[in-house]
Amino acid sequence: MKKSPGLSDYLWAWTLFLSTLTGRSYGQPSLQDELKDNTTVFTRILDRLLDGYDNRLRPGLGERVTEVKTDIFVTSFGPVSDHDMEYTIDVFFRQSWKDERLKFKGPMTVLRLNNLMASKIWTPDTFFHNGKKSVAHNMTMPNKLLRITEDGTLLYTMRLTVRAECPMHLEDFPMDAHACPLKFGSYAYTRAEVVYEWTREPARSVVVAEDGSRLNQYDLLGQTVDSGIVQSSTGEYVVMTTHFHLKRKIGYFVIQTYLPCIMTVILSQVSFWLNRESVPARTVFGVTTVLTMTTLSISARNSLPKVAYATAMDWFIAVCYAFVFSALIEFATVNYFTKRGYAWDGKSVVPEKPKKVKDPLIKKNNTYAPTATSYTPNLARGDPGLATIAKSATIEPKEVKPETKPPEPKKTFNSVSKIDRLSRIAFPLLFGIFNLVYWATYLNREPQLKAPTPHQ
């Protein structure tokens, strides 16, 4: 006999429907229960890992050498200071090693933790050998990451800003290239206890972000990695080295130094085309260009450290200074010979004065008349001939036309100096040859892409 459904059956159906809507069913835990269970599992795993753990002891103490694998991701490179010979770099510094004491078994394969756990376990005492100042970012919390896998392998990542030394050889400045190193290793553990290795192959162990360059005067050509051993009084230590290869941009220095020097030399050679009697003009050309070169040489050195050797720019400025100073000396030489009595063509510089000719005529009222001699007749003696002589000796002055002035002597000017003629050709030719050799030598040099790392 079939039994009709009762009140209990209706209640069972409604209970099953409501449990379906709320995500619950008989025999299955709720989501909150699952999260609570996972949190409990995490807590128990961490408590078990740290139970009896001594973070003062390195992994494998007394059994094996601890291997620390590293790689670097550069988020920002620069700026570079030539004066202080240093550079600034912002990196994500990653280290990985294995600690058997941190093995675990659980529903998860990786424990993702933050800096709080990192302070409770052993971590490598890595420091930067050539670092002047290193800063670990702490805003808003310490920028540190820790991952622990079930086999005890740890990944420890931190964000650092490092200001490191970059030894520079400025002989080729400003066509120079540099390899700025970043050296790091263990501070306390020798290579018998802790060794460092690159995580990946050399080409991928250090990576620079595409937009990571913060350089105005340099091009970042690339980077290379290396490793070596450094001997000290406390033992031998493994040192990992990364070289960042830089090539200086020359555009700024062409505009600020090279072009002004070239234009100053050309301006100094304009004086060769001026008349050698133009002493003030040629003196102004010479003195002004010499002072200009002096100012340029001083300003070019302001951005560089006080090195004891001459740079490529120093040689260029020195040669330009020599050309400008030689132009001034050339004018002094020409002027010295110009002051003498004869020019280079043998003609007299001082015009000859016309000789004075005595004129027997007397000028009177713009007329010329010969000198008249009067004889007084002696009538007392009664000599009739004397009266005749007196009469004939007196000659009335005749009007004479004014005599034309003698032609002025032809003025003799100094011809163009032979020294000036020679300088007009020699100076530009020599300066052009110098520029050709200078730029061909320095621009065709290949940058040194590999800096040596000492191995011992």
Curated annotation (Swiss-Prot):
GO terms, molecular function: GABA-A receptor activity; GABA-gated chloride ion channel activity
Superkingdom: Eukaryota
Known catalytic reactions: chloride(in) = chloride(out)
Disulphides: 166-180
Leader sequence segment: 1-27
Annotated keywords: Cell membrane, Chloride, Chloride channel, Cytoplasmic vesicle, Disulfide bond, Glycoprotein, Ion channel, Ion transport, Ligand-gated ion channel, Membrane, Postsynaptic cell membrane, Receptor, Signal, Synapse, Transmembrane, Transmembrane helix, Transport
Example of a GO biological process term: gamma-aminobutyric acid signaling pathway
Membrane topology term: Multi-pass membrane protein
GO CC annotation terms, alphabetical: chloride channel complex; cytoplasmic vesicle membrane; dendrite membrane; GABA-A receptor complex; postsynapse; postsynaptic specialization membrane
Cytoplasmic topological domain: 275-279, 334-421
Residues that coordinate or bind 4-aminobutanoate: 94, 157
Cellular compartments annotated: Postsynaptic cell membrane; Cell membrane; Cytoplasmic vesicle membrane
Regulation acting on activity, per entry: Allosterically activated by benzodiazepines, the neuroanesthetic alphaxalone and pentobarbital. Inhibited by the antagonist bicuculline. Potentiated by histamine.
Tissue expression as described in the entry: Cerebellar granule cells, Purkinje cells and stellate/basket cells.
Pfam families attached to this UniProt entry: Neur_chan_LBD, Neur_chan_memb
Glycosylation sites: 38, 138
Extracellular side: 28-253, 302-311, 442-456
Transmembrane segments: 254-274, 280-301, 312-333, 422-441
Subunit details: Heteropentamer, formed by a combination of alpha (GABRA1-6), beta (GABRB1-3), gamma (GABRG1-3), delta (GABRD), epsilon (GABRE), rho (GABRR1-3), pi (GABRP) and theta (GABRQ) subunits, each subunit exhibiting distinct physiological and pharmacological properties. Interacts with UBQLN1. Interacts with TRAK1. Interacts with KIF21B. Identified in a complex of 720 kDa composed of LHFPL4, NLGN2, GABRA1, GABRB2, GABRG2 and GABRB3. Interacts with LHFPL4. Interacts with NLGN2.
Stated family: Belongs to the ligand-gated ion channel (TC 1.A.9) family. Gamma-aminobutyric acid receptor (TC 1.A.9.5) subfamily. GABRA1 sub-subfamily.
Domain notes: The extracellular domain contributes to synaptic contact formation.
Record's function text: Alpha subunit of the heteropentameric ligand-gated chloride channel gated by gamma-aminobutyric acid (GABA), a major inhibitory neurotransmitter in the brain. GABA-gated chloride channels, also named GABA(A) receptors (GABAAR), consist of five subunits arranged around a central pore and contain GABA active binding site(s) located at the alpha and beta subunit interface(s). When activated by GABA, GABAARs selectively allow the flow of chloride anions across the cell membrane down their electrochemical gradient. Alpha-1/GABRA1-containing GABAARs are largely synaptic.
Name of the featured protein: Gamma-aminobutyric acid receptor subunit alpha-1
Gene: GABRA1
